[in-house]
Amino acid sequence: MRHRKSGRQLNRNSSHRQAMFRNMASSLVRHEIIKTTAVKAKELRRVVEPLITLAKSDSVANRRLAFARTRDQEVVGKLFNELGPRYQERPGGYTRILKCGLRAGDKAPMAYIELVGRPEAAQAVEVEAAE
């Protein structure tokens, strides 16, 4: 019985799942929008939102915790220097999931996951790239 077991397995073992979400979280922080399957996007929220909450209070201990979870110093820098101050007044809900149809190969539902309130210049570039 799987009572009280939260999170989706996604047909992967635990180390693969952990590595995948670590990479996806780093990509989302770096680019502020990524395209993935809808199910992975929903799971990714559970990884990224606590990282941003951690970045709202800058300390050496919090930076080390963020590094332990992402293993990427560049991502930790962006979290604490840009995203933490940007979301200082927001009490959660830092990501938005936008459904974008089905993948051509296997009809998997796809979605964009983006950080709320990302700069307008980046949004304009993404729209042009999509067209």
Curated annotation (Swiss-Prot):
Gene3D superfamilies named in the record: Ribosomal protein L17 (3.90.1030.10)
Gene Ontology biological-process annotations: translation
Superkingdom of source: Bacteria
GO cellular component: cytosolic large ribosomal subunit
Keyword Ribosomal protein attached: yes
GO molecular function: structural constituent of ribosome
UniProt keyword annotations, A-Z: Ribonucleoprotein, Ribosomal protein
InterPro entries with a match to the protein in the record: Ribosomal_bL17 (IPR000456), Ribosomal_bL17_CS (IPR047859), Ribosomal_bL17_sf (IPR036373)
Subunit architecture: Part of the 50S ribosomal subunit. Contacts protein L32.
Record-stated family: Belongs to the bacterial ribosomal protein bL17 family.
PANTHER family xref list: LARGE RIBOSOMAL SUBUNIT PROTEIN BL17M, RIBOSOMAL PROTEIN L17
Entry protein name: Large ribosomal subunit protein bL17
Organism: Shewanella amazonensis (strain ATCC BAA-1098 / SB2B)
